[in-house]
Design a protein with these regions (language model features):
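RNA-interacting cores
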Residues: 1-292
Length: 292
């Protein structure tokens, strides 16, 4: 199928379960938020063709001579050595048996060519950092009175609005990246993964009030609706870019960062955790386009 996010999600957990079953169980079980994201299988075709195939649910042929990419992010530092150890064990078992490490996505078997995690890959979608490094980097930012921020939503993004206070009309999927949808979700993810010494850096009440007071506004966008097919249902959403202005209000009370710096910190976090619904199944792949 042209969109394989849920299949990649399952394949990744199955691969990890074979190499490190305790880690896979910890990641999958319970009601905790996912501490990883997975992309759909990315084909070596133009973005336009890939999006058209998703929208029309047109299957793209696989060529054994081509290289296909899966992007996986790990949101806890403790997961990296576990992933590395699992990869080495899998590599050793593959060498002994004469088979290269592989992952089965649906009915297709893929051989692992390489793992890329450096910060300067031409794709612009790889990298590594720590939360403390992100905080220190953000501290050094010098902001204008109206600070621009552009986010690219590269895969289908939507927001599951089933937690609204009013249940009169039932849940729905929001298809616009309004500030009140984007930043509170990133704030919650920060609270999920930040250690105690960094949890206070992002101030929930101040950010929520700042957004409510229209401190963050949408000033430009290049968005379009999009749809894709999961195995059991069709999902609606959007893709594209959205430019925000963060207007001057830098009262970051009792925090290492000003209020607007906190929002820029969350924007950088979006590169790793994604935005919105089903980020562990290929949706919500996001990055800031400014050099933050």
């Amino acid at each position: 199928m042209p969109f394989s996010g849920e299949l990649v999600h399952g394949a990744w957990l199955h691969w990890l379960r074979c190499a490190a079953p305790d880690v896979a169980t910890w990641l999958h079980d319970g009601n905790r938020r996912r501490f990883f994201t997975c992309s759909s299988l990315q084909f070596p075709v133009s973005q336009q063709r890939a999006l058209e195939a998703e929208r029309e649910n047109v299957h793209l042929p696989l060529d054994p001579q081509q290289v296909y990419v899966v992007r996986i992010t790990l949101l806890l530092g403790e997961l990296f050595p576990l992933f590395y150890a699992a990869l080495m064990r899998f590599n050793a078992s593959g060498t002994e048996s004469g088979n290269a490490p592989c992952m089965q996505i649906g009915r297709q078997l893929f051989r692992l060519e390489e793992v890329v995690l450096n910060n300067d890959d031409p794709s612009g979608w790889t990298g590594f950092t720590s939360l403390s490094s992100l905080v220190e980097k953000t501290k050094r930012l010098r902001l204008s009175s109206v600070q621009p921020l552009t986010l690219e939503f590269a895969s289908l993004t939507t927001f599951n609005r089933n937690n609204m206070r009013s249940k009169s009309y039932g849940p729905h999927y929001a298809r616009l990246p309004l500030p009140q949808y984007v930043f509170p979700g990133l704030l919650r993810r920060w609270e999920d993964i930040a250690p105690p010494e960094l949890a206070h850096v992002v101030q929930r009440e101040l950010i929520e009030q700042y957004i409510q007071d229209d401190g963050v506004i949408v000033t430009d966008y290049d968005l379009r609706t999009h749809r894709l097919k999961f195995t059991t249902h069709q999902q609606q959403g959007f893709i594209g870019t959205c430019k925000y202005h963060l207007r001057d209000s830098d009262e970051g009370m009792h925090s290492a960062l000003s209020l607007r710096q906190q929002l820029l910190l969350l924007a950088q976090l979006a590169f790793y955790c994604g935005v919105g619904y089903k980020t562990s199944m290929g949706m919500g792949r996001t990055r800031p386009l400014e050099m933050l």
